[in-house]
Every structure is written in structure tokens, then in C-alpha cells.
Amino acid sequence: MLFRSGFKLKDEIYQFKAPYTRADRRVRVSLDLSDPATAAVKDGVKRTDGDFAVAWIKKQGLGRIFYCSLGHADNVFQDAGVLRFYLDGIQYALGDLEADARPC
């Protein structure tokens, strides 16, 4: 599964610096800046390219990587969809769940 689309969640996010790029990972969750409520949050925004990835997967050699920065606020751990996403990501990293990890 590796997450549903179009969900809203309040949480603190990381803003990645160079050399972060989508060119070597498959982003599974990112901020939707077309949403007025999300776009209105300007305090502390440092990225100028509008690319705010929150979770991704990638293959590294013979291994698999799952990264997710969700979880700064307590409410995140009460969201069944987020918990399912964590489980899917762990299963992907273990090799128990297939997912397309090609960058896009």
C-alpha cells in the first residue's frame, strides 16, 4: 500500500538541504503546497524549490531504505493510516512488501 493519497495531518516537518534530490529515491509523501492551508504556513520555510518530501523509499545496493519524518506530534501516532504506513515501510525495508522504488 505505502500510503493513501489526499490526507491531512498536522506535524512538524524537516526541510532537507543539499544534496537532497528526488533523482535517487521514490517520494511517497510530500507537502501539497496547492492546499491554501499548507501554503499559508511561511514561518521557517527555507526551501525555495517547493519540494518538501516527508517520506521515501529507495534501493541501496542489495538493501532497501524506508525513511519517514512524520511523528513529531502525538496526534500522528493516533492516526491509523500513519501506523499502517510505518508498517508497510518496515515490511518494504525487510523485503516482505514489494513497491516501485524507481525515482519519479
Give names to the regions the model predicted.
Residues 1-61:
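Catalytic beta-strand/loop cores that center a nucleophilic Ser/Cys/Thr
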Residues 34-55, 59-104:
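Extracellular ligand-binding/catalytic regions of CAZymes and related secreted enzymes
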